[in-house]
Amino acid sequence: AALTIREKSDASIIIAEKANIKRSGCLAAGVNAINAYIVEGRKPEDYVEYAKKDADDIVREDLLLTMSERLNEVTAKMEKLGLVILKDENGRYVARGNRNIKINGENIKPILADAVNSLENVIVINRLNITDYIVKDNTILGAVGFNIDTGEAYEIRAKKVLCATGGAAGLYKPNNPGFSRHKMWYPPFNTGAGFAMGINAGAEMTTFEMRFIALRCKDTIAPTGTIAQGVGAKQVNSLGEVYENRYGLTTSQRVYGTVRENIEGRGPCYLRTEGISSEQDESLKKAYLNMAPSQTLKWIESGKNPSEQNVEIEGTEPYIVGGHTASGYWVDTNRRTTINGLYAAGDVAGGCPQK
């Protein structure tokens, strides 16, 4: 947001970040694909239809369309900043399915941080936890917070405020117990603070009952799409049966089917990787190093490649996350909330899943 504002105005900008913008929040460890992209031969309306179907029509189509129309523009900006997007021998982006392109994105957050730190008249305050908005007569005046190391209080006055604090993890018992309880899909430090601040200030919110449960590789909680789309792996039960078509192929149906198979005694469930080529083995191990290195380490520690052993899968605990569901602030197509001068983006913005 700071980069775009600087392109269009000379406004003074303050970024308040609870951790450090170089490695914080979602994608802090990187990502191996841009999962929202209009690939060659597709159009923004196709992405809208996909998101609608995946969310059982619980969406705002106006928000989906205005987002979809700018996905490729934002991706092009990231490439100019230094993000490596994989290309084929003809120089075209390497697609992964109908909506994704492959990248080497371990450093996606440092790239953005370096770009922001090079801007004039932009102040980045790391380790500052914003706790409340300053609002009068339904108009934003700024925000207050505390340094998480020293406890020093901050009051920031601003004509406009953009909330991008992420969704809410930690609402449910995690898959992994004890010291591994933070080995989860969604960042444990995304606590829903942005939602709470909006509610306290009287902003209209939407669809909090829509929770997201991710289908992930067991134990490592690594993404499954890298395997399912990358090598065409099917979901199979302990009997070797492909069960995914029995329940449906939307995000929620894939998770529901896995849960049902386990309940009915046909678990554990897997992504069928046995028999893939050695080249695909290496491709998967490299891909996970860009996003979830624990999965690659698990293969190495076991002494078995994906081609020698199927990958067990499970659902995570539920999260409130507007990037995958429609939960969050009620916004218009300019991402303005119902509080004058307050905007919402990313996982705190409602109505627009599949961001």
Name these PLM-found stretches:
Residues D149-K160, T337-G341:
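Core beta-strand elements of the Rossmann-like FAD/NAD(P) dinucleotide-binding domain
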Residues L27, K173-G178, P353-K355:
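Short acidic, glycine/proline-rich loop/turn micro-motifs
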Residues N72, E79-T131, T139, T207-K355:
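Mobile, glycine/GP-rich and aromatic-enriched active-site lid/loop segments adjacent to catalytic centers
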Residues A33-A36, V59, S180-K183, T220, ...:
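Short beta-alpha connecting loops at secondary-structure transitions
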Residues A19, D149, A158-K160, A164-A169, ...:
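Glycine-/small-residue-rich beta->alpha transition segments that form the dinucleotide
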Residues C163-A222:
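Glycine-rich loop(s) and the adjacent beta-strand/alpha-helix scaffold that form part
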Residues R6-V31, G41:
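Glycine-rich FAD pyrophosphate-binding loop
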Residues N35-M67:
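Glycine-rich active-site loop/strand segments that organize a redox cofactor
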